[in-house]
Swiss-Prot record:
Signal peptide: none annotated. It is an enzyme of class 3 (hydrolase). Expressed in roots and shoots. Optimum pH is 6.5-7.0. Pathway: Glycan biosynthesis; trehalose biosynthesis. Its cofactor is a divalent metal cation. Its EC number is 3.1.3.12. It comes from Oryza sativa subsp. japonica (Rice). The gene is TPP1. Belongs to the trehalose phosphatase family. This is Probable trehalose-phosphate phosphatase 1. Keywords: Hydrolase, Stress response. One of its GO terms (molecular function) is trehalose-phosphatase activity.
Amino acid sequence: MDLSNSSPVITDPVAISQQLLGGLPSNLMQFSVMPGGYSSSGMNVGVSRLKIEEVLVNGLLDAMKSSSPRRRLNVAFGEDNSSEEEDPAYSAWMAKCPSALASFKQIVASAQGKKIAVFLDYDGTLSPIVDDPDKAVMSPVMRAAVRNVAKYFPTAIVSGRSRNKVFEFVKLKELYYAGSHGMDIMAPSANHEHSAEKSKQANLFQPAHDFLPMIDEVTKSLLQVVSGIEGATVENNKFCVSVHYRNVAEKDWKLVARLVNEVLEAFPRLKVTNGRMVLEVRPVIDWDKGKAVEFLLQSLGLNDSENVIPIYIGDDRTDEDAFKVLRQRNCGYGILVSQVPKETEAFYSLRDPSEVMEFLNFLVRWKKHSV
């Protein structure tokens, strides 16, 4: 499957409703501050410019700190040596967001007679969080687990990475890939059993296609301004740009926030949101991982909430958009990957990628025995 030389078209197996697309052409030209985003436009002109900038930078810095992992993880599989069971706060959180492994029987009981669709984040979910984003390699046993899941259920990778890059990590042609936080979606090869009958060509949907020149331009600007900050890296993910500060000294985080904010002053159609030790510069359109999940479900003909159980597993703030969609639809389960208590829209939790793999293997065994 060639993931690099496709044109931005939709070849839909089912009719895609205008309500789902949300009038994308008008949104592409519209500017508005999105929830969870920070922007330099639309402020009260009577307020001091410097004061506005300071408020923006401090708000972004607070978000950076709140999204930072509080424990040093073992790069082997995201494990650490502390005991969550001894932490009262963690125990209280687990009561609200219980283990998906311990609750597996309950999850599959609700799926009896229904179709399951599986959605997976990549970094921190299928691969460990590592200092160098280019080395977030998926293990062979995890790849085998995902491949087996895709044999029985429609399966998609929904990542902030570019679609091409996440495919290079996963290397499975039988999956759907939604890169750039769902702004770059491609179906698997047409011969795969979960591909729709009408999908004789590659399904490609890119709601932010018009932003490509702007993303390239802002990438160059960001590379230039953070080049003097030790540990800061910039990653062009095609329809969004990631500014990684995982390896930046905490004393320099405010400088990173300030420089990113200053760059975005020249790009009012872009916004910045925070992820796990990363700032994400994205187009200001009404599209996110939640919208991508809805689009994929409809494209697959799995939009019937009465007969479909979507399962979404992810570890980042951007995955909350997908968790929220599943809650609002009152259908399916969001599963947060975390070793620390977090505010979340997810129903269940898993500690790390090793537990994610165990859960995926559980799903496969359950399906084999239920056939």
